Amino acid sequence: MKRIVLFTWLTPTIDNICGPSALAYHTLKNRPDYYDLVIYTTNYNNISAETIRLISKEINAEIIIVRDDIYNYFHRRHTFAELRLKLRLDTSYGQSNYRLPKKYISQIRCYDPDIVIVFDEAFVKVARQLSNYNLIVWGYDCFPLHYSRLMRDSYCFSENNLYKQILYKYKVAIFRELQYEDIPCRIADVGIEDVNYYKIITGRNNVSFYPHPHYRVIDRNISFNKQKLKVIISGKFDVYTYSDMNKLVDVLKKHCNALKDKYIFTFLGKTWRNIVSELKLYGFDINNIDWVDEYAGELVKHDIQIFPISVGSGTKGKVLDALSMGLLCIGSNTAMENIYVRHGHSCFQYKDVNDIPAFLNYIYNNKGKAEIIAENGRNQVLTWHNPKRVSKLFLEDIDESTGLKYDGYKEYNKVVNALKSIL
């Protein structure tokens, strides 16, 4: 039996409660049987003790809540942290300064793991503490790439001084990556451009791309044989969707006469209310749902999902959700990056928001082809983003005893380049 230790600031949950990604949950839950797992979590997302016990059973792992020592108390929770932040003495608000208390280091030493994973590149000192093991620092994306893209987006200029704040965060993110220079470890990301950007800013090659696993799947029949097709837009109207969503509202208004009798639009989330009210004035059949307890159950009531994502990096788990459940997905290049799909074969990928009405009209007038594209999207994700497959190749690649070498970049390009559009 091989032994794995995971350190994470967020307790892994099936639907990434109060966190950016459920990557760790789904990858490690689906690990091969010969890997034992112990998780050390600071439980920053405040998951209840009862829920943690359930998660422990679901993923077959021991979960240990890390309690702060005096050092971390002053670096994370004490009011001095606010003062240091203002003086720019502690730019990460404690994450880069966070240390795993000695008690837990001793426990890990006794456990003698074959693999140690630090989830989130922000925890530099924890990585340094655990660098004498076979260490992988696992991130959902490269933070400097995110901020680099954000600085080119109109969101930066939506408020006074916002650009300066983002530029400052960009510099902090680069500094954090450079801190790994003398730490013997490997870096894992779920983004090809994330990997490339990391190499550019650090000059190091100790970083690899791995595909992101899909989450839960609900089997459904794909059928567009109906008078009105159902479209869903979920998530939030925030930094990630600000620019493209504002453009999409204007584009939908312009094409309302061609679309309003063909589609029912549903916006899932509280932040869409103003947009929904605005589009209702133009005669769209439109709904706004603030919250659902079962996200996947709501998703499969629809035929199409639009992802107006203008900023981001890594792989978007919500896009994988939709594709794996057979929804026909329309999204930006940013939304679809790192997913084993291709425009016209397994999704619709827009270069400009103005493309979306043409896609919607094509889908409505070519429902048979649209069903094939949706089915192709589902098959691609269920095959290449299968959690058991991803977990096995990820763990066996970083397990030094296997001798296996996985090239995610080569695999991705080979698979996607072989896909042919049916448009």
Regions found by a protein language model. Name each.
Residues 136-137, 167-219:
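Donor nucleotide-sugar binding/catalytic pocket of nucleotide-sugar-dependent glycosyltransferases
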Residues 343-354, 362-367:
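Conserved acidic donor-binding segment of nucleotide-sugar-dependent glycosyltransferases
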Residues 318, 328-332:
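Short hydrophobic beta-strand element within catalytic cores of glycosyltransferases
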Residues 26-27, 102-107, 143, 154-187:
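Membrane-proximal helix-turn-helix segments that form the acceptor-binding/catalytic region
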Residues 23, 209-280, 288-295, 300:
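Conserved catalytic-core segment of nucleotide-activated headgroup transferases in glycan assembly
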Residues 300-314, 325-327:
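Acidic donor-binding loop of glycosyltransferase active sites
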Residues 369, 378-423:
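C-terminal amphipathic helix plus adjacent low-complexity
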Residues 1-24, 41-43, 232-237:
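Nucleotide-activated donor-dependent transferases that construct or modify glycoconjugates
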